[in-house]
Amino acid sequence: MIHMDIVSLAWAALMVVFTFSLSLVVWGRSGL
């Protein structure tokens, strides 16, 4: 159970970082 929690937490963190970096790139391309 704890292993599953760690995996799900890692996936959530990965998605947050991915979306954050993606939005940052989009902002930079649009000309901040």
Swiss-Prot record:
InterPro entries in the record: Cytochr_b6-f_cplx_su8_sf (IPR036143), Cytochrome_b6-f_cplx_su8 (IPR005497)
Originating species: Illicium oligandrum (Star anise)
MF terms (GO), sorted A to Z: electron transporter, transferring electrons within cytochrome b6/f complex of photosystem II activity
Pfam families, A to Z: PetN
Keyword annotations of the record: Chloroplast, Electron transport, Membrane, Photosynthesis, Plastid, Thylakoid, Transmembrane, Transmembrane helix, Transport
One of the GO BP terms on file: photosynthesis
One GO term describing the cellular component: chloroplast thylakoid membrane
Complex formation: The 4 large subunits of the cytochrome b6-f complex are cytochrome b6, subunit IV (17 kDa polypeptide, PetD), cytochrome f and the Rieske protein, while the 4 small subunits are PetG, PetL, PetM and PetN. The complex functions as a dimer.
Bilayer-crossing regions: 6-26
Coarse class of the protein's main subcellular location: plastid
Coiled-coil stretches noted in the UniProt entry, renumbered to this chain: none
Localization in the cell: Plastid, Chloroplast thylakoid membrane
HAMAP family, A to Z: Cytb6_f_PetN
Topological relation to the membrane, as annotated: Single-pass membrane protein
Family: Belongs to the PetN family.
Protein name, entry field: Cytochrome b6-f complex subunit 8
Role, per record: Component of the cytochrome b6-f complex, which mediates electron transfer between photosystem II (PSII) and photosystem I (PSI), cyclic electron flow around PSI, and state transitions.
